[in-house]
Regions:
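Sec-dependent signal peptide recognition
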Residues: 1-7
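N-terminal signal peptide c-region/cleavage motif recognized by signal peptidases
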Residues: 11-13
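Active-site neighborhoods and metal-handling regions in enzymes and metal-associated proteins
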Residues: 15-409
Length: 409
């Protein structure tokens, strides 16, 4: 297993694919405009028994996929620190780039590349004229450096970088669209394969196999395929249950392509036909989603409260249909309506305010009624445009008639 993973890592590109190489220094230049101190970011630590996935903020600023690197920035300087070559490790993981390689500047996109042994001396030099030290507050390696400058003010690197990541570039949007197209194909393949008696994990396998075939290297998150009683469990991902006729199945599955995610959910009947009650609940969720999407545009309010997209969806659900006791259905819509999508499937910032052109978000209302074993969620990934929005996953049908024509056929 270790040798196999080593071979895989040996052929993996050190630099992020799909984003123009000159976009990364442009991102750093934009960050430096608001940087009033020293920023230090550490690449994610290596794990030789798992697929290596770079820390998203580090990847966003550097495009660098390999472990062991460190980024240090001020308003005027940016330096990438790389570990030295380890000949023994290279037997397992392939040739790494050494900070002393002749072509290191071309390969990294940094004019200044130093060995990791120079971190402390460089840090002490940079903080002489810097009032703050910006790092990710959960990083123990950064804490060790900060201990060298106990009188300096601490800054939050995550907050600064989140502002940049909120708006997507054309290249980022293209990768999210690629992931979305592959995910649409995966959902359709699962619908065609759907039948009573199959297990949830079999449907999940059809979906992952399909989007891997479209050039996506991994799932953006653990696939959720929840049937019957599992359809009312929001983040159910065990996918172990046998699906039976007469049930609905919530399929919340999305691909990741060249590090960028998408997020898509559809709810379909296992036997290809909604019951009258399932159809009623489904149509209410679909109506709520359409109402919210119709209001997506720059300036639209996120979060909770009057006038927000969340309230639009809630009001629709709460004024259409009743539960078995005659009460409104709003209490069964128990989660947020939206989040950002990008390098992370839940991209920063965590707190969403007014929408801006260039944001990529989800719209995902749901109703979950445990006493009826009916859970319905409909989710699309959406680009906010200058005059409204574009549904990046809009090629995946969601009308009842379209679904019933495709499931199991």
């Amino acid at each position: 297993m270790r040798v196999l993973l080593g071979l895989l890592l040996a052929v993996a590109p050190a630099f992020s694919e799909g984003i123009p190489k000159d976009e990364f220094p442009a991102r750093r230049a934009e960050l430096r405009k608001s940087l009033d101190g020293v920023l230090v970011l550490f690449a994610k630590a290596d794990d030789d028994l798992r697929d290596y996935i770079q820390e998203p903020n580090f990847l966003y600023l550097t495009g660098w996929r390999e472990p062991g690197a460190v980024l240090m920035m001020t308003a005027n300087e940016e330096i990438l620190f790389l570990p030295p070559r380890n000949r023994t490790a290279e037997i397992f993981y392939g040739r790494s780039i050494d900070p002393n390689d002749a072509d290191v500047f071309e390969k990294t996109g940094f004019k200044a590349v130093l060995p990791k042994s120079a971190i402390e001396t460089t840090f002490l030099r940079l903080i002489e004229n810097a009032p703050k030290i910006y790092s990710e507050r959960t990083d123990s390696q950064a804490e060790k450096l900060e201990a060298l400058a106990p009188l300096h003010e601490e800054g939050n690197a995550t907050a600064l970088i989140s502002k940049l990541r909120e708006l997507k570039s054309p290249a980022e949007i293209a990768l999210i669209q690629k992931a979305s197209d592959a995910t649409v194909a995966a959902h359709l393949a699962a619908w065609h394969a759907m039948k009573s008696g199959e297990y949830e994990y079999q449907i999940a396998a059809v979906m992952t196999y399909t989007y891997f075939g479209f050039g996506c290297e991994r799932s953006a998150y653990a696939p959720i395929v929840g049937s019957g009683p599992n359809s009312v469990v929001l983040h159910y991902s065990a996918n172990k249950r046998r699906m039976d006729a007469g049930e609905v199945v919530v399929m919340d599955v999305g691909a990741e392509c060249s590090d960028y995610a998408t997020d898509v959910t559809r709810t379909v009947p296992v036997n290809g036909k909604f019951s009258a009650r399932q159809k009623e609940i489904y149509e209410i969720v679909l109506g709520a989603q359409k109402a919210a999407i119709a209001a997506v545009k720059p300036g639209a309010k996120m979060g909770r409260g009057a006038g927000t997209l969340q309230q639009i969806a809630f009001d629709y659900i709460n004024t259409h249909g009743k539960d078995l006791h005659g009460a409104p259905l709003g209490k069964y819509f128990v989660h947020g309506l939206s989040h950002n999508v990008g390098l992370d499937v839940h991209d920063p910032p965590a707190r969403m305010e007014d929408l801006k052109a260039g944001m990529v978000i989800t719209i995902e209302p749901g109703i979950y009624i445990p006493e009826e074993n009916i859970g319905v969620r409909i989710e699309d990934t959406i680009l906010v445009t200058a005059d409204g929005c574009k549904i990046l996953t809009g090629a995946l049908p969601k009308e009842v008639g379209e679904i019933e024509r495709l499931v199991g056929k």
